[in-house]
Amino acid sequence: MFNSETESAMTTSSKCTRVFGFLLLTGVCFAQAPQPPRPPAESPTFSTQVKVVISPTTVLDKAGNYVNGLTIDDFELFDNGKPQRLTADIAFQPLSLVVAVQASSMLTDILPKIQKIGVLIDNLVLGQNGEAAVVAFDHRIRVLQDFTADAGRIDAAMKKLTAGSSSARLIDAVTDSVRMLAKRPDNRRRVLLLISEKRDKASEGKLREALTAAQLQNVSIYALDISHIVAQFTGQAEPARPSPIPATAQHVPGGGVQTPSSMEIQNNSGNYIPMLVEIFKAAKSIFVDDQVDVFTRYTGGKQYAFVSQKSLEKAVQAVGEELHSQYLLSYNPDNLDEGGFHEIRVKVNRPRLEVRTRTGYWVAARP
């Protein structure tokens, strides 16, 4: 059982994430047929067939505290509006984490702060039998450390972070990180922690492709947003632009005023799904100002801002607390004949609780 108190949440026993459902395969599982080699210039693709869907679910009370002790009978899950059967087996699922850090030239004064959090990632995030890899990106995508459970190697890799060019290939870094996570054993949970600005600079891949891959591989994306601290150091804040996410889709913090629209969002039924569908379909050109928000929101993750070493460390702790306080709901979709976007909605049959989970996943239409 997970303890919602901050002090005890990080104990070894609380780092075991609960999984509802027999995990035939981790995340959304796939059968992949051999494919002929593709020309190097093409964007990386993922060939997938959905079998089992896993939906990490965070439950908060009115004060914003994690709610523990729920059972399978407290949850209802809907896939495209159709109720799905959740099985009640409980298992332990160790964590595989990629830490992807923007290492561009404008971060010269900020990287020393980020270099110090390697030990915290091991102590506060990974948990029992956890492993991490470290990736740096500017105009290159560099793997500084492949997956390891060795805290010393993780810390050493973080200390290798150095500023490079002015580019920041955020989308390409997400795609490559998802590929790394997809190769991990099937019994591991997959998480990507981005430490970056909100906007991509010079990626070759598309947001749609990276997001589709993350959802199909059941990768939860969390982010530590460095935009505020960049503005603090450079004195040049980027001009604000309207969010691509409707105002009603914004998260209401614990203790905030609830409205009918915000309550719909917390049950995953808000009106921001159409924008996500347009991203997947690429039916028209859509300007997405904040790619990080799209990655975190639509994979069930969350983003945190920081402006100091202390707030950075608190953000890392908050990520660990959430990951190890979640319920992992698994089910076999019974409606895979419905091609396109499958919206996931989770309800808790107890009053005045806030629920956050992944919004859904994309399924190719069957011939």
Where are these regions (language model features)?
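Bacterial N-terminal signal peptides that target proteins for export
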Residues: S4-L23
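Scaffold/interface architecture of coatomer-like assemblies
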Residues: A31-P367
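Hydrophobic h-region of N-terminal signal peptides that target proteins for export
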Residues: L23-A31
